[in-house]
Amino acid sequence: MLSAKGVSLGLGLGLGAWGPVLLGVVGVAGALALYGYYKNRNAEPAAAEAV
């Protein structure tokens, strides 16, 4: 766990402390994209029926 270089976060990506940050940003962006996709997909039939 602890080495001469510092604390390893264990992602094995070679990104150091930025690994979890980038993973979190990618996760949040993916969740927002899926949320937007499902929200728009479910809204289309209702909009088509209203016309």
From Swiss-Prot:
Spans within the Lumenal topological domain: 1-8
The UniProt record lists the keyword Transmembrane: yes
Similarity field: Belongs to the magnetosome MamD/Mms5 family.
Protein name, as recorded: Magnetosome protein Mms5
Function: Might be involved in magnetite crystal growth.
Keywords from the named record: Biomineralization, Magnetosome, Membrane, Transmembrane, Transmembrane helix
Segments of this protein annotated with the region LG region: 9-16
Membrane topology annotation: Single-pass membrane protein
Annotated Gene Ontology cellular component terms: magnetosome membrane
Transmembrane segment boundaries: 9-29
Gene that encodes the chain: mms5
Entry annotated with the keyword Ribonucleoprotein: no
Cytoplasmic side: 30-51
